[in-house]
């Protein structure tokens, strides 16, 4: 086991808080992760066991094929139902886990970095059930997960020895050991959209564009994406354009997004369609300064993007970015990190 700084220490010291986060971050893994112990005064300790092994394909199939009702509880009828159900009632979960490694995202803690997926047959069976559900009009809103185009563990090393502690899979660039392949996901999408009663299959859970562009055969996926799975706009998440901020976010250089955008437009011309990209951006992320905000504004002006909304960073439990927001330091190096906290700084 490994001792964390005590509750009293992390409560009194931001440096101890950052140290505790770094230890937890490196041990959030089922093969190599150690049992973590945090002392709470002189009476007791809190013990956190390593995560369990991610569910297998067979286990995921069994769980997702249980006879769920697929709607809200009748107790909500008196209040008019739950409007948000419309966003997910005709969506299909195909995978769990994410090796994307974004600093502002807690999915690594919820589901782990090792991706596990349902079988194609299980997904098709669920899609068939959706076509028989009341209210189905021929549109499946999503076939995806934390990241839609992740269908397998990043590499063989990950399966044998666990995820790497010294580097991320995609940041600062895709690891050379990574198995990059969209053929399985393409097969799933083809099978679902070929079902009787299915008019269109959308992808709403997000395409990781740097992973797609690293695939030597990305043209095939891009063409089918534009031809069959985009309603008119595709939402992707470059998050910023300034290299310093992207580094803090653990996101790829903006040149990767630009290459993706050009490929997307090229595919549109080939198919004689007019589809748009809606890029997501985050303002005042830890490490983002006024000059970085100006750089982003100029980028938007030069590219012609007119965002109708911008997400201002807000701290959420369990993320690297939130640790930096609170401690104002990098938990792995101890280096100071600028954080815009006041309304004046954010504006």
Enumerate the predicted regions with their spans.
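Radical SAM enzyme [4Fe-4S]-AdoMet core and its adjacent flexible, acidic
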Residues: 53-55, 63, 154-183, 247-249, ...
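N-terminal pre-triad scaffold of radical SAM enzymes
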Residues: 77-106, 124, 139, 314
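Catalytic cores of alpha/beta
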Residues: 220, 285-302
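Short helix/loop capping segments that flank catalytic or ligand/cofactor-binding pockets
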Residues: 46-50, 56-58, 71-74, 101-104, ...
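Conserved SAM/AdoMet-binding glycine-rich loop
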Residues: 129-278, 282-286
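Conserved, mostly hydrophobic/aromatic
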Residues: 63, 98, 123, 236, ...
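Iron-sulfur (Fe-S) cluster-binding segments and ferredoxin-like electron-carrier domains
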Residues: 105-122
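Flexible, acidic/Gly-rich N-terminal and inter-domain linker regions that tether
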Residues: 1-88
């Amino acid at each position: 086991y490994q001792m964390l700084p005590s509750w009293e220490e992390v409560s009194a010291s931001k440096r101890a808080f950052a140290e505790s986060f770094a230890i937890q971050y490196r041990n959030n893994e089922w093969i190599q992760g150690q049992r973590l112990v945090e002392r709470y005064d002189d009476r007791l300790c809190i013990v956190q066991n390593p995560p369990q092994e991610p569910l297998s394909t067979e286990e995921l199939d069994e769980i997702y094929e249980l006879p769920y009702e697929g709607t809200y509880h009748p107790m909500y009828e008196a209040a008019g139902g739950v409007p948000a159900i419309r966003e997910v009632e005709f969506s299909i979960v195909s995978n769990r886990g994410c090796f994307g490694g974004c600093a502002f995202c807690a999915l690594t803690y919820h589901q782990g970095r090792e991706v596990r997926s349902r079988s194609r047959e299980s997904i098709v069976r669920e899609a068939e059930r959706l076509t028989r559900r009341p209210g189905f009009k021929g549109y499946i809103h999503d076939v995806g997960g934390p990241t839609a185009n992740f269908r397998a563990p990043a590499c063989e090393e990950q399966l044998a020895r666990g995820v790497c502690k010294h580097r991320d899979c995609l940041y600062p660039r895709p690891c050379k050991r990574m198995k990059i392949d969209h053929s399985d996901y393409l097969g799933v999408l083809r099978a679902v959209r070929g079902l009787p009663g299915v008019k269109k299959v959308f992808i709403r859970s997000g395409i990781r564009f740097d992973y797609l562009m690293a695939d030597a055969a990305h043209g095939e996926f891009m063409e089918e994406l534009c031809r069959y799975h985009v309603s008119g706009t595709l939402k992707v998440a470059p998050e910023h354009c300034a290299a310093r901020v992207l580094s803090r976010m653990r996101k790829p250089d903006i040149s990767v997004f630009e290459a993706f955008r050009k490929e997307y437009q090229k595919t549109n011309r080939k198919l004689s369609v007019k589809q748009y990209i809606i890029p997501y951006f985050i303002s005042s992320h830890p490490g983002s300064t006024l000059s970085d905000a100006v750089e982003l504004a100029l980028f938007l002006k030069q590219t012609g993007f007119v965002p109708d909304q911008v997400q201002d960073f807000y701290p959420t439990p369990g993320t690297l970015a939130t640790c930096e927001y609170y401690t104002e330091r990098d938990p792995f190096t101890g280096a100071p990190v600028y954080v815009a906290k006041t309304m004046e700084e954010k504006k």
